[in-house]
Structures are given as structure tokens and as C-alpha cells.
Swiss-Prot record:
Belongs to the BamA family. Disulfide bonds: none annotated. One of its GO terms (biological process) is protein insertion into membrane. This is Outer membrane protein assembly factor BamA. HAMAP family: OM_assembly_BamA. It comes from Salmonella arizonae (strain ATCC BAA-731 / CDC346-86 / RSK2980). It is found in: Cell outer membrane. GO terms for cellular component: Bam protein complex.
Length: 810
């Protein structure tokens, strides 16, 4: 079209200037039709200037130059004496862009596509570009199986040479696969081969991966899956001869036929390595060992190539080339693998840079590095730095990029690109149960205080039965070697009776200081000291409580509830952490083991020890880590020594969102057995079941939890992709199905003495529940929802099916 207009304009010029075919001197240049484009801008785009002598060729070049600006639909150049007259028709300006009928493609994606083609509000409209966009969008719909889709660009003229642009979509329905045929397979059935495809002609209800909707990209992936399936089983000559995709007349059905040649199975006869091995031939040879008579396996060959690259990468060879060429012997059905290695140049690290850490200081990230500047590049050291940054929990994502230094043959820069997450939080917890009602708790925590890496927290609980506050500070790098220093102070006023626990009041306060010593990349030891003061009062006489008091040399009256007791204890605190999780926030792979314990030291009123062991293991079952199995355990044990018992207020409890969901917090395990009250103290409204002997009250059984000195909790969780959540938010939302179990018992309970009551020393009284949980790092903060149904419980257990926590982050 442009060339046609150019030809017409040239002919017009020629016919108007027959007498001037030899050219003329331009004394002036005038424009007609300019509206949006400035005269100066138009003049700058022209090769002709006032005073130039021009001929027909110059005029043709002028027309081409004006068309090339993209601002004009039509250009004519005429001569009026010694004046060059340029007549133009500007392209209309796009005033607005709207979309209608698009469901599969979001508006933002469409706008990005249009802008990439130069179509945006305020720019000139090129109608030829619209045709290309229409075709490109329709091709996209065809690739996802929507063959009846159409896209039409509607241009509505507006005053002042403006237009409204509207893209109207008719997406239609996705064509469904009616049948998939594989022709030429003999070793494996068609059903077996198709079972590994994403595309299916039949999808069982339980298959959440299979899809009958045709997509060109998925078919290409399935063909690669088919190829790998055969190559991994020794079929080195396997070939996909052709693929036919047939569409039904109504464009709603798809028939797929894949023609293959299986060939025979081949065994590996040997591996021969050659090339520039950079002095690491022995290590490389070790990576290429094969078992005699082993079938040829394409995946193992690829892994071998990757392992060689990783090996060389650890020694500074950042860009090695490894190529494997199978040499097939059809006579004896063997394959000899020839591996050519070119290690390339060895690289130094010039600089390590960080991008995206707007809050965190560079020093906080740099101290996690194992790769040093000025040293040989080690790919394993770079990866360790990435792992350590992920485990900090400060970042949503951490990516690395090794960039060559321009002009240098042996230097690179290592760039860590991070996306920070909100590490400060104000947490507000709510629980609701049919028997417990509503409970609240709150806390303020900043894990990366002012970007320094310090962890600062103020946590508290305020409800009907407890007032708790705690201030904690941890410096993870108290020394340059990574020794951490942490401390806390706390105050707790606990009314156990109002918490459906055994009746007593404990007002306590204390502090502790802990040092952490890194042993290696994954192991840390901790040691510290602590002090705690406990002031007990209003202790209603019950067996476990009185047993402890007797061991402490106290002999309170079992008919008196107004007993009081105070202790001051100094403890040696210890711990060990093994952490090989892939990241600190929403891990998907790895294991974390945490051991914490304490023991009283001389100068304490109590003499006891206590320890807990927590483990969590994440096992991904797909390459993208979207489907993950999580196993968690928690074990606890404590006891007294020197003839004393562990204090009852140090007992272990289970139940609640952090242990066994579906049960009210802290209510699993032994229940209080009270001594008979004096008549003046007995409250008939208390939920006691009292036995009588000779007309007098004997011991009274209750539903009040007292905990125990031993605990075991386990959980099996299946983490799945969250439905209806886009990829953009996938890292911020986690859905899981879980099965929790747990038990708490008292090893010092004498069942022979209390034969008419449950045996609270029996660890086999296991509670179980199952349910679903949703975790979301929302703009308002972390939200955790769970719904669990207890399916194994005992008398006195309290259910709390629905639990959730909400918070505010900054």
C-alpha cells in the first residue's frame, strides 16, 4: 500500500514538473495536513532542506522518509514554483484501548502484547499492525485448542483525528481429545504409554494432572515424554516418524495419531572420555562408570553430562561444554558413548553484588556468602550462598546470575537477585471451639530489624486466664565467625482454672541468654543460662500437684485450696539445630531437626531436666516442588532427680494448631484427679466425678488437663497446589491435607494406687485428627486456617475443629 501511494505521489510530482525534470532549488517548504506532528519534527525526518537542489529521486526519498516515521497514512509532494508543498494525512491517535470477551487471556497480558507491537494509548494507529495482532491472537487460541476463536479489532473514529480501539474476542470452546492412537508400538501397550501423557482421551476423576483439552504445547511435551520413555529403556534407535492432529468438522473434537518406530534394545558397551579435562580426568572418569550390560538410558546420559559440568564448575570452569555422542553398533546391539569435554577458561570472581535488597543491608547478605571475591569461581559455593539466603527467611525468592566481565577473558561477577518479603509481623491469633469459645493472642516480631539481620520480638497473650509478655533480641552474627547471641525477658500471670486446666495460679518472671555456635553449613550448637522465679498460689489439691509438693518437702493440707509456694531456679540451657531446608519460608525440600533442653544447676530450688526434639522433613514428589509430602514429629521428656519431681507447671501439653489440630489447645493427656474437698470448699458446679466411700467423698475425677512429663506428636501432611491461584501468588499461598496424632503421659503416675481411674502412665492413648489447612502470606499479614475433625479421642478431650491466625506485617 505504501509503495502504491509512493508511486502515485511520484507520478503526480513528475506530471506537475515536466519542465523541471533536471531539478530545481527549493526556496521554501510548506506542509498541509499536520495536526499532531510538529513542523520541526516533520522537517527533521526529511532528507531535503531549503536551498537544496532536488530531483525526482530526492522527492521519492522524502516520501519514503515521511512514511518511515509511522505518523502518516498518506504523503504527497508537489512543486509550487520554488516551494516544495508536502501534503500529509496523519494516522489517527489512539484515545483508548478496551477488550471484550477475553476470558483465557487477561487484560494486562494483552496490553503488554500490544505495547510490544507499538500499539498504546497516545500513539498513532497503524492498521496493518492490527491485522498482525488479530492473526497472532487467533494463532494463540488455536495452539490451546480453541479452533473456533476469532479476534476482531474495531476502530471507532473520534473528533480531532482520534480513535477508540476495541479488541472483540469470541473464544469459543476448547476442542477435546476424542482419541489418541500410537501406531508402531510393540514392547509397550498404548495404554501404558499414554498413562505418562498430560493430554488424555480419558481422564479418571482422581487424575488432577490429565487433561482432555488439546494444547499444542502440551502435545510437544508429551512427545518428548514418549521419546524419553523409550530412550530410558534402551531403545536407542527409537524415532517418532510423524504426528497427525485431525479436527472434527464442528471444530470441537481432536484425534491424535503418533507413528513411531521402536527399534531394538541396546546395551552400553563403554564410555570413552576425551577433550580438555582441565586435570580432572580421574574425577570425570569416576562419573562415567557403568555397570556391565547396563541398558542405554538417555536420562542417565543427560545426568552424567550435568554432573561433569557441575564438577568442573566447582573448580572455576564456569562455561564447560560436554557433548555425548552415542556410537551405535547394530550388529551386537550395543552403544559406545563418546563424551567430549571442553572445560574452557577458568574464571575468577571479580565482585559479588546484590540486587533487590531495599531493606536488608549488603553486609547482612554478604556474611552468608561462601564464595569469596578474588577467588576461583566455585559453582557449589555460589549455590551454598543461595541456600543460606533462602534459609534466612527474609526473601520470597533468591536467584543467582553469573555475568562475564566485558573485556576480561577470565573474570565474572556473581549477582544475587532477591525479592524481599515482609519480615516484621503483628500476629493476632483467634481460636474457636464448640466448648472453648473464643481465645486471643498477639505478638510483634521483626526478624530483620532495620535490615541489620537482628531479630527483635515483643510477644504477648491477654485473655481470661493469662497475661504473658516477652521481649527477645537475637544477633545472628555476634562475632564475625557467625556465633549468635540471643536473650529474652518475660513475665507470665497464668490462671490455670480459667484455661480448663488443673486449678492453680502461677506468677512467674525470668530471663535467659544463649550463644549459638555454627559447626558447619547445616549444624548449630547452642548453650546458655537462665533464671526463673515462680510464685504459686490457689492450688486446688490434686494428685500430680501434691506429688510434686511432697517431693519438694512440702506437706500442704489436702482440704485447703489456699496453698502457696515459691521457687527460684537457675538453668543451663542447651540446643542443637540441623537445618537443610531449601528456604526459611514455605520450604519444599529438606530436613530440619531442633533439639532444646534445660537442666537446673546448683543454687536452684528445683532439680529437674527437660528436653524436646522437633523434626520436619519435606519431600517433593514432582520436579517443580508443587506437590510435597511433609512429615513432622515432636518428642518431649523431663523428670526430676535428687528425689524431686519435675514441676507440674513444666509439664508437656498437646492439642491446638501447633501440635494436634482439631483439639483445644493443651487439653490432650492426663486429667486432674482431685483430693476430696472440705465441705466448705466444695463447689457443686465444678465438673468433677467423685467416688464415695462410707458415705464420704473419695477421689474426684475431672476433665481438667494437667499435662505430663512425656509427649509424642506426629503429623503427615500432603501439600498441594492451591486451586484458582495464579502463578504470581503461588509462593505466597499453601494448601495441605493433614493427619495429626499425639499423646501425653505421666511416667510417675502410679496406676496401682489409683486403680479406679484412667492409667495416665500409658503412652498408647493416642489422639488422632485429619483435616485441611490453608496458609497465606497476605498483604495484611500471615493467615493460617485449619479445619480438623478428631476421629480418635477419649473422655474429657475438648474438640476445636476450626482454628485460624491472622496478622499484620510490615
Amino acid at each position: 500500500m505504501a509503495m502504491k501511494k509512493l508511486l502515485i505521489a511520484s507520478l503526480l510530482f513528475s506530471s506537475a514538473t515536466v519542465y523541471g525534470a533536471e531539478g530545481f532549488v527549493v526556496k521554501d517548504i510548506h506542509f498541509e495536513g499536520l495536526q499532531r506532528v510538529a513542523v520541526g519534527a516533520a522537517l527533521l525526518s526529511m532528507p531535503v532542506r531549503t536551498g537544496d537542489t532536488v530531483n525526482d529521486e530526492d522527492i521519492s526519498n522524502t516520501i519514503r522518509a515521511l512514511f518511515a516515521t509511522g505518523n502518516f497514512e498518506d504523503v504527497r509532494v508537489l512543486r509550487d514554483g520554488d516551494t516544495l508543498l508536502v501534503q500529509v494525512k496523519e494516522r489517527p491517535t489512539i484515545a483508548s484501548i478496551t477488550f471484550s470477551g477475553n476470558k483465557s487471556v487477561k487484560d494486562d497480558m494483552l496490553k503488554q502484547n500490544l505495547e510490544a507491537s507499538g500499539v498504546r494509548v497516545g500513539e498513532s494507529l497503524d492498521r496493518t499492525t492490527l491485522s498482525d495482532i488479530e492473526k497472532g491472537l487467533e494463532d494463540f487460541y488455536y495452539s490451546v485448542g480453541k479452533y473456533s476463536a476469532s479476534v476482531k479489532a474495531v476502530v471507532t473514529p473520534l473528533p480531532r483525528n482520534r480513535v477508540d480501539l476495541k479488541l472483540v474476542f469470541q473464544e469459543g470452546v476448547s476442542a477435546k481429545i476424542q482419541q489418541i492412537n500410537i501406531v508402531g508400538n510393540h514392547a509397550f501397550s498404548t495404554e501404558e504409554l499414554i498413562s505418562h501423557f498430560q493430554l488424555r482421551d480419558e481422564v479418571p476423576w482422581w487424575n488432577v494432572v490429565g487433561d482432555r483439552k488439546y494444547q499444542k504445547q502440551k502435545l510437544a511435551g508429551d512427545l518428548e515424554t514418549l521419546r524419553s520413555y523409550y530412550l530410558d529403556r534402551g531403545y536407542a534407535r527409537f524415532n517418532i516418524d510423524s504426528t497427525q492432529v485431525s479436527l472434527t468438522p464442528d471444530k470441537k473434537g481432536i484425534y491424535i495419531t503418533v507413528n513411531i518406530t521402536e527399534g531394538d534394545q541396546y546395551k552400553l558397551s563403554g564410555v570413552e572420555v576425551s577433550g580438555n579435562l582441565a586435570g580432572h580426568s580421574a574425577e570425570i572418569e569416576n562419573l562415567t562408570k557403568i555397570e556391565p550390560g547396563e541398558l542405554y538410558n538417555g536420562t542417565k546420559v543427560t545426568k552424567m553430562e550435568d554432573d561433569i559440568k557441575k564438577l568442573l564448575g566447582r573448580y572455576g570452569y564456569a562455561y564447560p561444554r560436554v557433548q555425548s555422542q552415542p556410537e551405535i553398533n547394530d550388529a551386537d546391539k550395543t552403544v559406545k558413548l563418546r563424551v567430549n569435554v571442553d572445560a574452557g577458561n577458568r574464571f575468577y570472581v571479580r565482585k559479588i553484588r546484590f540486587e533487590g535488597n531495599d531493606t536488608s543491608k549488603d553486609s547482612v547478605l554478604r556474611r552468608e556468602m561462601r564464595q569469596m571475591e578474588g577467588a576461583w569461581l566455585g559453582s557449589d559455593l555460589v549455590d551454598q550462598g543461595k541456600e543460606r539466603l533462602n534459609r534466612l527467611g527474609y526473601f520470597e525468592t533468591v536467584d543467582t546470575d553469573t555475568q562475564r566481565v566485558p573485556g576480561s577473558p577470565d573474570q565474572v561477577d556473581v549477582v544475587y537477585k532477591v525479592k524481599e518479603r515482609n519480615t516484621g509481623s503483628f500476629n493476632f491469633g483467634i481460636g474457636y471451639g464448640t466448648e472453648s469459645g473464643v481465645s486471643f493472642q498477639a505478638g510483634v516480631q521483626q526478624d530483620n530489624w532495620l535490615g541489620t539481620g537482628y531479630s527483635v520480638g515483643i510477644n504477648g497473650t491477654k485473655n481470661d486466664y493469662q497475661t504473658y509478655s516477652e521481649l527477645s533480641v537475637t544477633n545472628p552474627y555476634f562475632t564475625v565467625d557467625g556465633v549468635s547471641l540471643g536473650g529474652r525477658i518475660f513475665y507470665n500471670d497464668f490462671q490455670a482454672d480459667d484455661a480448663d486446666l488443673s486449678d492453680y495460679t502461677n506468677k512467674s518472671y525470668g530471663s535467659d541468654v544463649t550463644l549459638g555456635f555454627p559447626i558447619n553449613e547445616y549444624n548449630t550448637l547452642r548453650a546458655g543460662v537462665g533464671y526463673v522465679h515462680n510464685s504459686l498460689s490457689n492450688m486446688e489439691p490434686q494428685v500430680a500437684m501434691w506429688r510434686y509438693l511432697y517431693s519438694m518437702g512440702e506437706h500442704p493440707n489436702t482440704d485447703d485450696q489456699n496453698n502457696s509456694f515459691k521457687t527460684d531456679d537457675f538453668t543451663f540451657n542447651y540446643g542443637w539445630t540441623y537445618n537443610k531446608l531449601d528456604r526459611g519460608f514455605f520450604p519444599t525440600e529438606g530436613t530440619r531437626i531442633n533439639l532444646n533442653g534445660k537442666v537446673t544447676i546448683p543454687g536452684s530450688d528445683n532439680e529437674y531436666y527437660k528436653a524436646t526434639l522437633d523434626t520436619a522433613t519435606y519431600v517433593p514428589i514432582d520436579d517443580d516442588h508443587k506437590w510435597v509430602i511433609l512429615g513432622r514429629t515432636r518428642f518431649g521428656y523431663g523428670d526430676g532427680f535428687g528425689g524431686k519431681e519435675m514441676p507440674f507447671y513444666e509439664n508437656f501439653y498437646a492439642g491446638g494448631s501447633s501440635t494436634v489440630r482439631g483439639f483445644q489447645s493443651n487439653t490432650i493427656g492426663p486429667k486432674a484427679v482431685y483430693f476430696p474437698h472440705a465441705a466448705s470448699n466444695y463447689d457443686p458446679d465444678d465438673d468433677y466425678e467423685c467416688a464415695t466411700q462410707d458415705g464420704a467423698k473419695d477421689m474426684c475425677k475431672s476433665d481438667d488437663a494437667v499435662g505430663g512429663n512425656a509427649m509424642a506428636v506426629a503429623s503427615l501432611e500432603f501439600i498441594t497446589p492451591t486451586p484458582f491461584i495464579s502463578e504470581k501468588y503461588a509462593n505466597s499461598v499453601r494448601t495441605s491435607f493433614f493427619w495429626d496424632m499425639g499423646t501425653v503421659w505421666d511416667t510417675n503416675w502410679d496406676s496401682s494406687q489409683y486403680s479406679g481411674y484412667p492409667d495416665y502412665s500409658d503412652p498408647s492413648n493416642i489422639r488422632m485428627s485429619a483435616g485441611i489447612a490453608l496458609q497465606w502470606m497476605s498483604p495484611l499479614g500471615p493467615l493460617v486456617f485449619s479445619y480438623a475433625q478428631p476421629f480418635k479421642k477419649y473422655d474429657g478431650d475438648k474438640a476445636e475443629q476450626f482454628q485460624f491466625n491472622i496478622g499484620k506485617t510490615w
